[in-house]
Amino acid sequence: MSEIPPLPPGSRPPGPKPLIGLPACIWAEGEHPFHKVGDKYVRAVALAAAGTPVMIPSLQTLIDMPDLLSRLDGIVMTGSPSNVHPDLYGQLATEEHEPYDPARDATTLPLIATALSDGVPLFAICRGFQELNVALGGSLHAAMHD
């Protein structure tokens, strides 16, 4: 695992560390589902951004998005091994493009819409960028080689 260097001393503005939300994926460990965020994203927020990472569980409508976002200073829309479900951008789902994470989709798309409308800074990586595109009405190519 490559190390993420921390910010140089004195390069972060004074005051409390920013709270940065990281949406979680749901993955099964045997029969039990777990909410997970990749270590590289957690470390990047903590070290490179000198922030405090806050996992956002994929609980869909159980999360009050405006309330959550009023407490966060930004969002990092993380990458994931899963793909955005093709139903969300007008395509057909296939086993070839699995896995999908419908709970994450149902959480992140409203999260993005609320963050954008409330002016909360958002940084998107890989799957997160695909979610941003779909949340704004865009489409995706399920496989670039097609």
What are these regions (language model features)?
Residues 129:
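The feature captures the ABC ATPase H-loop/switch
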Residues 1-123, 133-141, 145-146:
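N-terminal beta1-alpha1 cap of cysteine-dependent amidohydrolase-like domains
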Residues 126:
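Conserved G/P- and acidic residue-centered "switch" motifs that form tight phosphate/ATP-binding loops
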